[in-house]
Swiss-Prot record:
The keyword Nucleotidyltransferase does not apply. Disulfide bonds: none annotated. Phosvitin, an egg yolk storage protein, is one of the most highly phosphorylated (10%) proteins in nature. Residues 1-40 are annotated as: Disordered. Keywords: Phosphoprotein, Storage protein. The keyword Metal-binding does not apply. Phosvitin is believed to be of importance in sequestering calcium, iron and other cations for the developing embryo. One of its GO terms (molecular function) is nutrient reservoir activity. Residues 11-32 have a biased composition (Low complexity). This is Phosvitin.
Amino acid sequence: AELGTEPNAKTSSSSSSVSSTATSSSSSSASSPBRKKPMD
């Protein structure tokens, strides 16, 4: 049971971390082209 819980918690944490990074990257990427377009 312990072994099953450890990997389970790690997967959840990893998923959350990846989701956060993906969202941040997406926001930055979208802002970059959006700002360059009007600037151009």
